[in-house]
């Protein structure tokens, strides 16, 4: 399949093991191909009746799934992972068409997706409580039990991967899931739903409900939704938290960031430059944990900046389905204009643009209406500038200089966000000392933006709470029951 040829021809809701049109609507949305600006779908946003049907369907599947053994759930997840591997290129192409990231990156996203399913398949078969001996031969034990119907709300930057990150632990624990993709990227979650069905999951175990804010509200406030896991912006996360609070629902929030990347003078310069590029330009800079505040020790600032600019200018921008493309378009026209606005604001506030920050028109005429820009490096930045304080969510790196470790730690932590942070240094004591002081949920030492499924991922402060990936996520998709067993006579005060 080539850029500019795909059009959605099937329903985008998935309920009861099949694609369906919603029985009612709360408006419509359009989905676009970012590379060309071409509309690929107009779809109905699910109304309250459709949400109710999806929840009832998921409840029925939950009754079946929650009674299966961990080994039986493991087998379904492993089969789903196998199918994802088998359909790797197909899924990656769909992701690239609807999201705009390069096919090179999209394939890596698919790989981390099947790895996630395999990891939680292993945990599904090993979930257990504990036995506690009590006086007189009595004892207690704990059971880790599923919550019920869980709601996953995805973001548009990693549509398929996020659907896997949320559904794999939920299903491993014995839950059912309803997944609402971002209306910007409605396509690839349907592929995952079909894969779960083909792998042997009960019909309704993973339903996909399309829609915007109104659909999300129907889902969050539904009495039979037991848990909400959301990836997205801080303002939307606050609204979801308010809605979930009214139903006393547990939630996981993975929100925005303005992460610091600290480059000490004793670093391996080659690796530090690579790390800075990874921290800023993956998925066109549209990554919540990006290290967009790059603090460079003064002794190496000039050399580091020169090399970062040189390598940034070499990044191949263009058709995201071509193998040599490393940067595709941003998600849509309003977001492109927003990011370009941050660059204009930075210049007005005194920052210097060393490269990029401009709209880009690829040579291929079919891409002329795509949402492209050149990756941008800003220098002469100060901590009070808008480009340094606010999440841009685009390919814009702000370089700042520092002199001492104590100084940079204070500045790095001076933010309401706390999703990630990074440090490059050859001093292993300093590396661990700095990581301990950084106020962030994930700290990278001598690397950046790696996400092994074995490691928990989540934020501090306004970047959210709860975790995705790692063994600990089982605790966020289950509840603990304590059983107390008396082996003797009851001693009573009455």
From Swiss-Prot:
The keyword Acetylation applies. Gene3D superfamilies: Aldehyde Dehydrogenase, Chain A, domain 1, Aldehyde Dehydrogenase, Chain A, domain 2. It holds the Pfam family Aldedh. Keywords: Acetylation, Cytoplasm, NAD, Oxidoreductase. It catalyses: 4-(trimethylamino)butanal + NAD(+) + H2O = 4-(trimethylamino)butanoate + NADH + 2 H(+); an aldehyde + NAD(+) + H2O = a carboxylate + NADH + 2 H(+); 4-aminobutanal + NAD(+) + H2O = 4-aminobutanoate + NADH + 2 H(+); formaldehyde + NAD(+) + H2O = formate + NADH + 2 H(+). GO terms for biological process: aldehyde metabolic process; carnitine biosynthetic process; carnitine metabolic process; kidney development; liver development; protein homotetramerization. One of its GO terms (cellular component) is cytoplasm. The active site is at residues 254, 288. The modification N6-acetyllysine is found at residues 30, 298. Detected in lever (at protein level). The modification N-acetylserine is found at residue 2. Pathway: Amine and polyamine biosynthesis; carnitine biosynthesis. InterPro entries: Ald_DH/histidinol_DH, Ald_DH_C, Ald_DH_CS_CYS, Ald_DH_CS_GLU, Ald_DH_N, Aldehyde_DH_dom. One of its GO terms (molecular function) is aldehyde dehydrogenase (NAD+) activity. The modification N6-succinyllysine is found at residues 30, 59. Its EC number is 1.2.1.47, 1.2.1.3, 1.2.1.46, 1.2.1.19. NAD(+) binds at residues 180, 232-236, 391. It is found in: Cytoplasm, Cytosol; Cytoplasm. Converts gamma-trimethylaminobutyraldehyde into gamma-butyrobetaine with high efficiency (in vitro). Can catalyze the irreversible oxidation of a broad range of aldehydes to the corresponding acids in an NAD-dependent reaction, but with low efficiency. Catalyzes the oxidation of aldehydes arising from biogenic amines and polyamines. Belongs to the aldehyde dehydrogenase family. Homotetramer. This is 4-trimethylaminobutyraldehyde dehydrogenase.
């Amino acid at each position: 399949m080539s850029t500019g040829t795909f059009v959605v021809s099937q329903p985008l809701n998935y309920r009861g093991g099949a694609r369906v049109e919603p029985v009612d609507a709360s408006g419509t949305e359009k989905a676009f191909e970012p590379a060309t600006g071409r509309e690929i779908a107009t779809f109905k946003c699910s109304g309250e009746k459709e949400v109710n049907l999806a929840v009832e369907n998921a409840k029925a599947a939950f009754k079946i799934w929650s009674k299966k053994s961990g080994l039986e759930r493991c087998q379904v997840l492993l089969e789903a992972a196998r199918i994802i591997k088998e359909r790797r290129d197909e899924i990656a192409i769909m992701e690239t068409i609807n999201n705009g990231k390069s096919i090179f990156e999209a394939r890596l996203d698919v790989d981390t997706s099947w790895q996630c399913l395999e990891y939680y398949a292993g945990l599904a078969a090993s979930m257990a409580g504990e036995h506690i001996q009590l006086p007189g031969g009595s004892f207690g034990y704990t059971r880790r039990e599923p919550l019920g119907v869980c709601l996953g709300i995805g973001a548009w930057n990693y549509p398929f991967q996020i659907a896997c990150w949320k559904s794999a632990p939920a299903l491993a624990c014995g839950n059912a899931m309803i997944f609402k993709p971002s209306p910007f990227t409605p396509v690839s979650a349907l592929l995952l739903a079909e894969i779960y069905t083909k792998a042997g999951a009960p019909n309704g175990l993973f339903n996909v409900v399309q829609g915007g804010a109104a659909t999300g509200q129907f889902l969050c406030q539904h009495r039979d939704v037991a848990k909400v896991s959301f990836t997205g912006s801080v303002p939307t996360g606050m609204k979801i938290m308010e809605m979930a609070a009214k139903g006393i629902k547990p939630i996981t929030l993975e929100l925005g960031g303005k992460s610091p990347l600290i480059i000490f003078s004793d670093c391996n310069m080659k690796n530090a430059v690579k790390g800075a590029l990874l921290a800023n330009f993956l998925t066109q800079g549209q990554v919540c944990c990006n290290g967009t505040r790059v603090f460079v020790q003064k002794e190496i600032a000039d050399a580091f900046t020169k090399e970062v600019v040189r390598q940034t200018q070499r990044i191949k921008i263009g058709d995201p389905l071509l193998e040599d493309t490393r940067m595709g378009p941003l998600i849509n026209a309003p977001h492109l204009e927003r990011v370009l606005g941050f660059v204009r604001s930075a210049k007005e506030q005194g920052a210097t643009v060393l490269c990029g920050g401009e709209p880009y028109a690829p040579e291929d005429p079919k891409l002329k209406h795509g949402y492209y820009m050149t990756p941008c490096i800003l220098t002469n930045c100060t901590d009070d500038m808008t480009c340094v304080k606010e999440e841009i969510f685009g390919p814009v790196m702000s370089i700042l200089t520092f002199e001492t470790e104590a100084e940079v730690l204070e500045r790095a932590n001076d933010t309401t966000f706390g999703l990630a942070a990074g440090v490059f240094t050859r001093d292993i004591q300093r590396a661990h000392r700095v990581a301990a002081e950084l106020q962030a949920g994930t700290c990278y030492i001598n690397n950046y933006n790696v996400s092994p499924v074995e490691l928990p991922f989540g934020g501090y402060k306004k970047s959210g709470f709860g975790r995705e990936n790692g063994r600990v996520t089982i605790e966020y998709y289950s509840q603990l029951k304590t059983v107390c067993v008396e082996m003797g006579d009851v001693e009573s005060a009455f």
